[in-house]
Amino acid sequence: MSVTADGRRMLRIEAKNAETPIESKPRWIRTTAKVGPEYRDIKNRVKGAGLHTVCQEAGCPNINECWEDREATFLIGGDTCSRRCDFCQIKSGRPSPLDMDEPRRVAENVREMGLRYATITGVTRDDLDDEGAWLYAEVVKKIHELNPNTGVENLTPDFSNRPELLKVVFDSQPEVFAHNLETVPRIFKRIRPAFKYDRSLEVIQAAHDYGLVTKSNLILGMGEKKEEVRAAIKDLADAGTDILTITQYLRPSSMHHPIERWVKPEEFMEHSDAAYELGIKAVMSGPLVRSSYRAGRLYAQAKQARGEAIPENLKHLEETLDSTTSQEASTLLERYGASEDTPVTASRR
């Protein structure tokens, strides 16, 4: 019997994944930390108030850049997800009871950090009658109430595509409603067994029909083929997706899905071009791009492309439109030059 480091018995899929060693990264999977005054200010505020963000706790490679833009991400609903995805490092199992005071605390954290844009994400809560819809909506409302000049992005589960639950979330009026598709139909059930490809598209379509700015994410390197990525992008565009992020899968541990391929920056650029051609309004594509990376900038870009004015209280987000993005594929090519084929091999560490 295989067990985890904390003594838990491994799931069958985890034991199978663990047979493949952790992979060695190619040269373009690198970060360069540049620390500016906004980052230092937020870091001092977080440390002084004992705050917690996904940015720090997940060791996000883009924390310096996002905090310099005064953006951060918060995980709500607890630390245990009622579903398991083969790429995700959040533990799965029976979640703890809901913390009804969490919306207030998150909103106060946003105020304490002086954020211009906040992304709210969280675990799936199939154990609750409303699957956590109240919580996702209430956090948005509280942030807007205490922080009228802060944009809010709500990155949610699918709420089983129940219209009455989606409406609760939509009515909270986040600047962006996000639901991540993550991968292509052929391998979807293997990677996200508790989700459904078509259902995720229907959730995005519902948000689009409601009138919200919509967003999704694709993770590459889990076994998909290049042409399948293009087809998934088209599906997202047809569902009314305004913003798309595309990223390289990085394996959290040996118990997670092995990396099938390292996707070159050149291919990320091709997918970005395809997304724009298919009508998606704002795209960020690169190996270390994450779904909340430069989120305020992407919101502002999407609003402009939709022909809509950015609200006066969020005009400051326009300042980010011309800033450089260190993790976009085009920037990586300028930094490292053309890529060579990099087969997936075991790490020497």
UniProtKB/Swiss-Prot annotation:
Gene3D superfamilies (alphabetical): Aldolase class I
Cofactor note as given: Binds 2 [4Fe-4S] clusters per subunit. One cluster is coordinated with 3 cysteines and an exchangeable S-adenosyl-L-methionine.
InterPro entries: Aldolase_TIM, Elp3/MiaA/NifB-like_rSAM, LIAS_N, Lipoyl_synth, rSAM
Pathway(s) the chain acts in: Protein modification; protein lipoylation via endogenous pathway; protein N(6)-(lipoyl)lysine from octanoyl-[acyl-carrier-protein]: step 2/2
Pfam families: LIAS_N, Radical_SAM
Record's keyword annotation contains Lyase: no
One GO cellular component, as annotated: cytoplasm
Cofactor: [4Fe-4S] cluster
Annotated positions binding [4Fe-4S] cluster 1: C55, C60, C66, S292
Catalytic activity: [[Fe-S] cluster scaffold protein carrying a second [4Fe-4S](2+) cluster] + N(6)-octanoyl-L-lysyl-[protein] + 2 oxidized [2Fe-2S]-[ferredoxin] + 2 S-adenosyl-L-methionine + 4 H(+) = [[Fe-S] cluster scaffold protein] + N(6)-[(R)-dihydrolipoyl]-L-lysyl-[protein] + 4 Fe(3+) + 2 hydrogen sulfide + 2 5'-deoxyadenosine + 2 L-methionine + 2 reduced [2Fe-2S]-[ferredoxin]
Classification via PANTHER family: LIPOYL SYNTHASE, LIPOYL SYNTHASE, MITOCHONDRIAL
Family the UniProt entry places it in: Belongs to the radical SAM superfamily. Lipoyl synthase family.
Protein name: Lipoyl synthase
Organism: Corynebacterium jeikeium (strain K411)
